[in-house]
Every structure is written in structure tokens, then in C-alpha cells.
A protein has these predicted regions:
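Structural beta-sheet core signal
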Residues: 34, 64, 130-132, 155, ...
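Substrate-binding cleft of extracellular glycoside hydrolase catalytic domains
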Residues: 1-121, 125
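Extracellular LysM carbohydrate-binding repeats and other cell-envelope/extracellular binding modules
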Residues: 215-218, 222-248
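Functionally critical loop-and-helix segments that line ligand-binding/catalytic clefts
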Residues: 1-12, 24-26, 138-201
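Solvent-exposed beta-strand motifs enriched in subsets of small alpha/beta binding domains
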Residues: 65-67, 204-210, 230
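Anion (oxyanion) recognition and catalysis
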Residues: 56, 164, 218
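Primarily a LysM-type cell-wall glycan-binding module
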Residues: 197-221, 243
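Acidic/histidine-rich, metal-coordinating catalytic segments
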Residues: 98-102, 127-138
Length: 248
């Protein structure tokens, strides 16, 4: 797999130990997204405080996450902000809105927009990320058109070839690390890490180890036959790291 910059989402399932975080750092993770609040939980701040403290002590970049079922956008935003402020997160911190729509929510898109509106009062829209499972998109619980394209999009699609969504800026590729339940992701464009791995504004892409014609076509939204034709290549041709691939 291509060596993109990595992020880790931590929550109540994540081991609360310095040793575990050191293992994450050794694996190449230096950006941690700490779940500060979760719908239906009033005491989540204690867990968030421990994870925030450990990550900061190890000089990891710390970002914030709100896990929501979209049932009560105002309550979710208010509780999130109280923890956000208490733990010293500030304007400019990246914030992930993790959407797990409750089945009783009649209009998930409307409530998501309401929640994003509340959060935008204290988080710049350029620092907001909407995270959602690929399954919810496939089932139509939420559609890509429901998520404004000026927000980063994180797609949770573990154990697959790629994010499965061309627009994805971050892809959660696994749910496990060191035999623990742990969401890890590739940060394609450096939204969290500040390290972009793609020449998105250029007509060419510099191939990295593990790239294939399929992954490049999917990631850049290029029709595979067209990509092959532009590069005078065949589907079975191997890609060499450092090779320059024409995108348009």
C-alpha cells in the first residue's frame, strides 16, 4: 500500500497508555484525532482528557472529533464545545464530525447541516472534516451531495483496496492495530498532517510504492481506460515508484 501520512482516531476503546501511543508513533502516526464527545454519553470528557494529555506529552499533533448519531445536533454541539474549550483546543484545530446516523432520524442530511452550522460558530469551515462509513453512503442514509465539498471528507472503508469514493481526502483503512480496536487512516491531501502526498493541481502524479493503475484512477477520478490510453499502458503493466503518470 502507498505510504501516505497516517492518522489515528482514538476513543474509549483505545488503550490509555504511553506505551501504546509510542507504538503508534513508531508505526508512523503523529496525528491523533481525539473523540471529545459522543451522543448519549455525558462523561466522555474524562476519557478525552486522558488521551489528549498522553498525545500532547509525546509531542503528537492533536485534533478533535465529535461522534454523533444526529438525533440532537444542538446538544451534541454544545457538549462538544464545552469539552473542546476545557481541554484547550483552539481556533485552527482540525475537527472531525463522525456521523453514525440513528435509524430514527428522518432527515439525516438536514440534521447534519444543522450540526455543521452550530460547529461552524467556533470552528472555521476550512478546519472541518465530515467522516462517514462507506456503508451509509451505499445505503443512501447520506449522500455525497449532502456534504458540502469545502469540507474534508473522511470515508470509513476498512480492509478494502481504497476509500471507494473519489472525493475522499482521508481514508480509514483499518479497524485494528496491535490486536486492539483502532481506526487508522491515510491522509491523502494532508488535511490533518500537513503533508500532501499527491500533486492534485498538476497534470502528472508521481507514483509511490504499491500504486496500481486501478488505485490511481480511483483516487484521481480518472476513467481507467482513459488513464491507460494517456500513458500508453496496459492494465497488467506494473507501476514503478517515481514513475510520472499523466492524469489529463
Amino acid at each position: 500500500m502507498t505510504k501516505y501520512s497516517q492518522i489515528a482516531i482514538v476513543d474509549s476503546m483505545t488503550p490509555k497508555s504511553v506505551e501504546y501511543y509510542e507504538k503508534l508513533k513508531k508505526a508512523g502516526v503523529n496525528d491523533v484525532i481525539v473523540t471529545l464527545s459522543r451522543s448519549g454519553y455525558s462523561s466522555y470528557s474524562e476519557i478525552a482528557e486522558i488521551h489528549t494529555d498522553i498525545a500532547r506529552r509525546l509531542d503528537m499533533r492533536v485534533h478533535a472529533a465529535l461522534s454523533t448519531d444526529l438525533r440532537s445536533p444542538f446538544h451534541d454541539a454544545r457538549h462538544f464545545f464545552s469539552v473542546y474549550k476545557y481541554l484547550g483546543y483552539n481556533f485552527g484545530s482540525k475537527t472531525m464530525i463522525m456521523c453514525y446516523p440513528d435509524g430514527n432520524v428522518k432527515n439525516a442530511a438536514k440534521t447534519l447541516h444543522e450540526l455543521l452550522g452550530y460547529i461552524s460558530y467556533f470552528v472555521n469551515k476550512d478546519d472541518l472534516d465530515v467522516a462517514i462509513s462507506k456503508n451509509y453512503l451505499d445505503e443512501g442514509v447520506l449522500n455525497l451531495t449532502d456534504i458540502p465539498d469545502y469540507f474534508n471528507l473522511t470515508v470509513i472503508n476498512p480492509n478494502k483496496l481504497n476509500a471507494g469514493v473519489d472525493r475522499a481526502g482521508t481514508w480509514i483503512y483499518t479497524e485494528y492495530f496491535e490486536d486492539e480496536i483502532q481506526l487508522l487512516g491515510y491522509d491523502y491531501y494532508g488535511f490533518y498532517t500537513g503533508q500532501s502526498n499527491q500533486l492534485t493541481l498538476d497534470a502528472e502524479y508521481v507514483a509511490q510504492e504499491g500504486d496500481t493503475w486501478v488505485t490511481i484512477a480511483t483516487r484521481h477520478g480518472v476513467w481507467l481506460p482513459k488513464l491507460l490510453d494517456m500513458n500508453d499502458a496496459k492494465y497488467e503493466d506494473k507501476i514503478i515508484p517515481g514513475q510520472r503518470i499523466r492524469l489529463f
